[in-house]
């Protein structure tokens, strides 16, 4: 093989400077053509391959940016030592190492397995492939050996070529087969004796067992054939009798169940009628009760209408409103009369919503003494007001409420059953001093 070196390396040559080496490696690696190694021989392939390993790969292909100079020099010396080992152990003996195919793969495209800065990993892998002692041999027979094999009886010429045990071992020579002949005969004699006894026992047992089984089966069949009609009739008679008895028992049970169900249904119907009658009585009582409640509601409505008219006809001598919460509505209908009593100066009262739908007055501690003193006066006045209220209620129902009427809070002398009415939506015409009166509505 010519060792022509190229100064300008083509990009498609994978960094290999020898054209002949590039073509050989591409044929071996890509196409798997091993004959190129046989035809070229170690004398032409190994020199260019060793030069590519020791010079091109460490300096032109890989770079060591992370490693120090000492590490790079160590890797280069290791590659030089591998080249010397290949030269001394294989090139001088005119043979290839048995790992030559893997060495060709690593040298043809090292970046397929390692990165550009992983020279140390590449050197480790190459050392494992090169540090061997076995040589690579191709078992190709010459023309003379083929003629001798044709003359001899070859065991490979058999009908069943798939049996690997009958294939001839290629590295076995005639001398080896002659030495193994007595040993093989002894093994065959032992195996044949053991297999012979086993086969005879199996054959005898097989025939005896089959004959006994066949005779037994025949006798059983004859017995069954003789007693077949009797056995079948007896079986079906027993089965039919059992079925008839079962059907009769089931019919009686069904009839008893039907009668029980009918009696239960009749009892249920009677209970339903009683329930309906009781329900009708309860409905009548509910209707009576509803009628009485309706009358009570009418009386309550009349009483509330009278109270509403009473609220409208009160004098404008109103007391100050109760002490309010931030969420309560304002009432600025203050009293402008010149006369003020002690009751006017007391703490405002608080109205409590009772369960009857009316408001009751909760008096403050300051006004409790004054109210106790005036209790007798209020009792007499309340009796007179009740008489007037009955007359005014009759008039208030006929007159009704005008749309422009205003609601006024009750006075301190009014009864506790007076009702407060919301003042939302009322125009404050008379209260000019009210803060809400100045606000545009």
Curated annotation (Swiss-Prot):
Residues 201-213, 264-302 have a biased composition (Acidic residues). It is found in: Nucleus. Residues 201-220, 242-348, 364-418 are annotated as: Disordered. InterPro entries: PPP4R2. One of its GO terms (cellular component) is cytoplasm. Residues 388-398 have a biased composition (Basic and acidic residues). The modification Phosphothreonine is found at residue 347. Residues 249-261 have a biased composition (Polar residues). One of its GO terms (biological process) is meiotic recombination checkpoint signaling. It comes from the Eukaryota. The keyword Ion transport does not apply. Pfam families: PPP4R2. Keywords: Nucleus, Phosphoprotein. Transmembrane segments: none annotated. GO terms for molecular function: protein phosphatase regulator activity. Belongs to the PPP4R2 family. PANTHER family: PPP4R2-RELATED PROTEIN, PROTEIN PHOSPHATASE 4 REGULATORY SUBUNIT 2-RELATED. Present with 1010 molecules/cell in log phase SD medium. Regulatory subunit of the histone H2A phosphatase complex, which dephosphorylates H2AS128ph (gamma-H2A) that has been displaced from sites of DNA lesions in the double-stranded DNA break repair process. Dephosphorylation is necessary for efficient recovery from the DNA damage checkpoint. Regulatory subunit (R2) of the histone H2A phosphatase complex (HTP-C) consisting of PPH3, PSY2 and PSY4. Interacts with SPT4 and SPT5. This is Serine/threonine-protein phosphatase 4 regulatory subunit 2. It comes from Saccharomyces cerevisiae (strain ATCC 204508 / S288c) (Baker's yeast).
């Amino acid at each position: 093989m010519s060792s022509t070196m190229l100064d300008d390396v083509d990009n498609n040559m994978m960094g290999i400077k020898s054209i002949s080496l590039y073509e050989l490696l591409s044929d071996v690696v890509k196409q798997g053509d091993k004959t190129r190694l046989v035809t070229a021989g170690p004398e032409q392939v190994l020199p260019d391959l060793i030069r590519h390993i020791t010079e091109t790969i460490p300096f032109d292909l890989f770079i060591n940016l992370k490693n120090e100079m000492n590490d790079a020099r160590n890797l280069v010396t290791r590659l030089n030592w591998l080249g010397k080992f290949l030269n001394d152990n294989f090139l001088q003996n005119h043979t290839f190492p048995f790992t030559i195919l893997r060495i060709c793969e690593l040298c043809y495209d090292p970046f397929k397995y390692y990165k550009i800065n992983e020279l140390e990993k590449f050197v480790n892998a190459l050392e494992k492939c090169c540090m061997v002692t076995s040589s690579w041999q191709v078992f190709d027979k010459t023309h003379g050996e083929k003629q001798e094999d044709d003359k001899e009886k070859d065991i490979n010429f058999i009908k069943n070529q798939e049996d690997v045990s009958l294939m001839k071992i290629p590295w076995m020579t005639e001398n080896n087969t002659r030495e193994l002949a007595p040993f093989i005969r002894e093994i065959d004699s032992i195996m044949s004796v053991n297999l012979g006894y086993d086969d005879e026992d199996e054959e005898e047992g097989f025939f005896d067992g089959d004959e006994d089984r066949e005779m037994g089966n025949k006798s059983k069949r004859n017995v069954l054939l003789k007693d077949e009609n009797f056995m079948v009739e007896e079986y079906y008679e027993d089965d039919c009798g059992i079925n008839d008895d079962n059907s009769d028992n089931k019919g009686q049970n069904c009839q008893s169940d039907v009668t029980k169900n009918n009696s239960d249904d009749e009892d249920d119907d009677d209970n339903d009628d009683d329930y309906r009658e009781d329900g009708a009585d309860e409905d009548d009582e509910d209707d009576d009760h509803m009628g009485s409640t309706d009358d009570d509601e009418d009386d309550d409505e009349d009483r509330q209408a009278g109270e509403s008219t009473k609220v409208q006809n009160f004098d404008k001598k109103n007391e100050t409103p109760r002490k309010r919460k931030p969420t309560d509505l304002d009432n600025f209908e203050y009293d402008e009369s010149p006369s003020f009593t002690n009751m006017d100066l007391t703490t405002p009262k608080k109205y409590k919503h009772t369960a009857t739908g009316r408001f009751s007055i909760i008096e403050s501690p300051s006004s409790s003494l004054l109210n106790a003193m005036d209790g007798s006066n209020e009792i007499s006045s309340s009796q007179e007001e009740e008489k007037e209220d009955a007359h005014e209620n009759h008039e208030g129902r006929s007159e009704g409420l005008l749309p422009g009427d205003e609601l006024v809070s009750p006075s301190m002398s009014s009864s506790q059953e007076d009702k407060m009415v919301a003042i939302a939506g009322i125009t404050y015409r008379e209260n000019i001093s009210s803060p809400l009166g100045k606000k545009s509505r």
